[in-house]
Amino acid sequence: MPRIPNGITTDGFSFYRWWQKGKQYVWDKIIRQIFLGDSDIDPNRFFFFGISEGAYGSQRLASFYADYLAGVGPIAGGEPLVNAPSENSANIAFCLGTGSLDDSYGRNALTAAAKADFERLQAAHPGYYDHKIDVVEGAYHGTANLLYYDTIPWLINKTRKTNPKYVYWERLEQDGIYRRGFYNLYIPETEKPTERRCYEMTITGNTVDIKVNKVSYTATAWEDKHGMPIAYDKTYTSVSGGKLGIFLGNELVDLTKEVTVNINGKQAWKGIPELKIENLVNSCALYYDPYRLYPAYVEVDL
């Protein structure tokens, strides 16, 4: 798309952001057409790229739609991480480049913050959080020869990781919309949440371990030019209440054997999952993804 959305302003609010509700409806339709349509597009080589405003959008959308993506390439951007949690990008390739002299809206400082965050996460989770994030020395916002030419060569051979056995989902809101599914996880309740929850799933053999916490943010550092927060402390607290659905296929566990689901270290379900056509139908209707047609489904109380 060669331009930002129309910048109509109503009641002091501008509608030219790529992550806003009206654009999400379009993204959802595009994703469905790509993943279930007759196009020649490989659903495992689907990327978001963007420059400037498009960089903000692609970084946000990467965190929101990571389960559909092979990778993302924001250029000359930098989004506050409260809007685009790095944790959600565990299974995609993430490439971000911003000039060291690009200080408007804290772009250089926010890019440096993202680099530090991805390095922290990659060290804690080897094999995940594949990234190339650079604050390019001497580059301004529009220094094309220094910023633009590394992104596609680095991403070109990346492919989507389907059915990963480690998933982190910080279920954030984008313009009033919450996704109800992410990778193989599903939120049965339809009402909007009153808190931001994090779901961290690790599958080992036939054991599914899931940590569920509430997260809150406290800004700890600000950039000088505009006073925008660039660093946060995250506080996690245990939660109770609600339900969580887990779709399962043979890509994730051995469905002929007993499966154990633990929530925050306590056994929440154990048994041999029933294989039902309705689970295939429901997972297709939820994800619109040929690689996520799951015959088994388990729902647990939190």
Please report, for each region that a protein language model flagged, where it lies by residue.
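N-terminal low-complexity, intrinsically disordered tails enriched in Ser/Pro/Gly
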Residues: 53-54, 76
